[in-house]
């Protein structure tokens, strides 16, 4: 069976991405990162999601990039703001995060002799992060072609972003068609230890908007009624 490494955070998009990988018949290897994020409950969710989808193997790689600061998701001196629209790159952007994550996933994929890496990046209904754009995925694909044994031998590892052109509503509809239970997921940047969401950060607002537009009941549990 063909193998794939799937990056999972515990959130809505990456969980949908894992469901897509399963639907394609991949033998799935799930990879998460403990990078010093404040919303640590997403990793608790990710572990449960990996077990729910019966992945072949689930790994959590610990990184110390949070010590460098520079993002409201990792730096205790910076507050996660309420939703502010997508006019500029927000303070919740973690510098080079997807590049770091994909690089480690690429190494694991080589070790596993996997055909693909799947990431839940989307350039629609997103927070404006530069490493969630189609041109970024294309650039990393070029890197994978040039910098791996498989790539040099003509069997490059494919970098797949199946949600890249989907709105949040379209992603949710896709996930529901594949049987995803979104009540298991944690998307909030300010989620508490129980995984309850704040309802007001970028991620929460985009998630609420997605369920509303998809006309599907939002199963998210919030700290206070929103």
Swiss-Prot record:
Entries under InterPro entries matching the protein: QueC, Rossmann-like_a/b/a_fold
Binding note for cofactor: Binds 1 zinc ion per subunit.
Binding site for ATP: 8-18
Molecular functions per Gene Ontology: ATP binding; ligase activity, forming carbon-nitrogen bonds; zinc ion binding
Swiss-Prot/TrEMBL GO biological process terms: queuosine biosynthetic process
Assigned protein family: Belongs to the QueC family.
Protein name (database record): 7-cyano-7-deazaguanine synthase
Species: Coxiella burnetii (strain RSA 493 / Nine Mile phase I)
Gene encoding the protein: queC
């Amino acid at each position: 069976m063909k193998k794939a490494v799937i990056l999972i955070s515990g959130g809505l998009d990456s969980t949908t991405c894992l469901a897509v990988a399963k639907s394609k018949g991949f033998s799935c290897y799930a990879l998460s990162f403990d990078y010093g994020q404040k919303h640590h409950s997403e990793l608790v969710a990710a572990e449960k999601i990996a077990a729910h989808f019966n992945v072949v193997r689930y790994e959590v790689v610990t990184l110390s990039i949070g010590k460098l600061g520079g993002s409201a998701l990792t730096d205790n001196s910076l507050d996660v703001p309420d939703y502010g629209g997508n006019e500029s790159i927000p303070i919740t952007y973690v510098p080079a995060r997807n590049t770091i994550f994909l690089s480690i996933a690429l190494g694991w994929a080589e070790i596993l002799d996997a055909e693909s890496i799947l990431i839940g990046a989307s350039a629609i209904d997103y927070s404006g992060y530069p490493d969630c754009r189609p041109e970024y995925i294309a650039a990393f694909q070029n890197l994978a072609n040039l910098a791996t044994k498989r790539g040099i031998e003509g069997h490059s590892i494919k970098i797949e972003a199946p949600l890249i052109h989907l709105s949040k509503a379209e992603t949710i509809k896709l996930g529901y068609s594949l049987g995803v239970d979104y009540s298991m997921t944690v998307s909030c940047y300010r989620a508490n230890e129980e995984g309850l969401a704040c309802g007001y950060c970028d991620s929460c607002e985009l998630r609420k908007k997605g369920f509303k537009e998809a006309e599907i009941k939002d199963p998210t549990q919030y700290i206070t009624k929103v």
